[in-house]
């Protein structure tokens, strides 16, 4: 168990702690990082209590329950022996940057290596050290230089980190902090097209919308509208509308990426949002696959499109709800893990548009390939489920 305490490193810290970075103030970001790092209690000088903090606490009950406001003269708790995680309120500290500090005990204290040489150390310290500085910590007076000196005297262990950390000392450092945050916006499931196309576009949208009251779910609904426009372009597609459909689908994907980025940047992640995002992605892909069959002409190809749409739906359901070890097991291999990603889907759409333009009579080939290929993922998962476990 660990306790966290936000402190002010110097006289310039209070306005910087209240400065917004990607839609949330630095002080709020530090509080959330402490909560997500596992802090059971987050002590915060009442000097940092402002309207933005209060709004965040209303939106995040778990954070509100963990935060304890410190006032001048409040006594330090002498009973608890849990170490303190000291966090400068005017720095950008991502939760992933705190992992090395909390990975192992530190009897003499530990300090985040990138912060060790500066006046705003991020440190895990034993209770006696906090007791020495408690009067100033509780009153919200600057303690950065004094803390840095005591850590050196105590022989605190410097621990490296790869997580984002930026010491914001002047207002011009806020831009660097925002850039560091953007590095964290990708997710493990991102494909090559996601990283090099969608994320590049979505970050422009996210930068704008995090400064507005727009919610991630509202952005998701916009991506649905754009996706429906892409489906319309592929339905009974012409050479022109097929290529237009590809471009509209690109825009839908960019907006779809922005909703998750906004949610992560503003701490609005939710189960509802995740389910809505998955549902919209599935609707768009299913609709486009069905459109490919309809555009190929004839009742038979319409049925082929319906078969492909069914396969996409089943694959999406299996990928969403199966345990990871079943969804992608060693016997299925990496191929099925990537069979439904957007890179492959783009290849399908571009192939369809090219054939509609250059060889219209051959577009049915794409619909047939999709109808057969879309079954591979869910059939592979089903085979793994039915296979006896060792």
Outline where the language-model segments fall.
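Membrane-embedded alpha-helical segments that form the functional core of polytopic membrane enzymes
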Residues: 216-272, 363-369
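Short amphipathic alpha-helical coupling elements at transmembrane boundaries
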Residues: 203-211, 260, 264, 274, ...
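Conserved small-residue-rich
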Residues: 188-233, 237
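Structural motif
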Residues: 7-11, 44-49, 87-91, 115, ...
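A feature for the membrane-embedded catalytic helix bundles of lipid/isoprenoid biosynthetic enzymes
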Residues: 118-205, 278-390
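Conserved beta-loop-beta/alpha segment of the NTase-like Rossmann-fold superfamily
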Residues: 58-120
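Juxtamembrane helix-boundary/capping and inter-helix hinge elements in multi-pass membrane proteins
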Residues: 72-73, 266-272, 327-328
């Amino acid at each position: 168990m660990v306790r966290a305490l936000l402190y002010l490193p110097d006289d310039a810290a209070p306005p910087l702690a209240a400065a917004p970075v990607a839609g949330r103030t630095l002080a709020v970001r530090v509080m959330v990082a402490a909560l997500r790092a596992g802090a059971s209690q987050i002590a915060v000088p009442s000097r940092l209590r402002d309207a933005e903090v209060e709004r965040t606490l209303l939106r995040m009950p778990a954070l509100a329950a963990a935060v304890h406001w410190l006032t001048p003269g409040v006594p330090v708790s002498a009973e608890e022996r849990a170490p303190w995680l000291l966090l400068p309120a005017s720095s950008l500290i991502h939760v992933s940057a705190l992992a090395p500090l909390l990975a192992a005990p530190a009897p003499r204290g530990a300090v985040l290596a990138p912060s060790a040489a500066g006046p705003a150390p991020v440190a895990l310290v034993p209770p006696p050290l906090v007791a020495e500085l408690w009067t100033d910590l509780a009153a919200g007076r600057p303690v950065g230089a004094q803390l840095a000196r005591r850590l050196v005297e105590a022989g605190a262990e410097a621990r490296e980190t790869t997580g984002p950390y930026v010491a914001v000392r002047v207002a011009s450092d806020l831009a660097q902090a925002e850039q560091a945050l953007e590095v964290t916006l990708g997710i493990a499931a991102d494909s090559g097209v996601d990283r090099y196309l969608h994320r590049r576009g979505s970050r422009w949208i996210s930068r704008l919308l995090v400064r507005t009251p727009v919610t991630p779910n509202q952005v998701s609904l916009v991506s649905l509208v754009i996706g429906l426009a892409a489906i319309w372009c592929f339905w009974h597609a012409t050479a022109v509308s097929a290529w237009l459909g590809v471009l509209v689908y690109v825009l839908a994907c960019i907006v779809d990426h922005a909703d998750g980025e906004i949610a992560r940047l503003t701490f609005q992640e939710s189960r509802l949002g995740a389910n809505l995002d998955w549902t919209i992605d599935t609707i768009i892909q299913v609709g486009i696959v069905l459109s490919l069959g309809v555009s190929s002409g004839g009742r038979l190809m319409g049925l082929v499109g319906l078969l492909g749409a069914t396969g996409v739906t089943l694959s999406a359901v299996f990928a969403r709800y199966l345990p990871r070890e079943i969804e992608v097991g060693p016997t299925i291999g990496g191929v099925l893990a990537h069979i439904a990603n957007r890179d492959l889907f783009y290849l399908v759409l571009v192939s369809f548009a090219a054939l509609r333009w250059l060889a219209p009579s051959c577009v049915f080939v794409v619909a047939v390939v999709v109808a057969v290929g879309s079954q591979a993922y869910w059939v592979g998962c089903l085979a793994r489920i039915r296979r006896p476990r060792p």
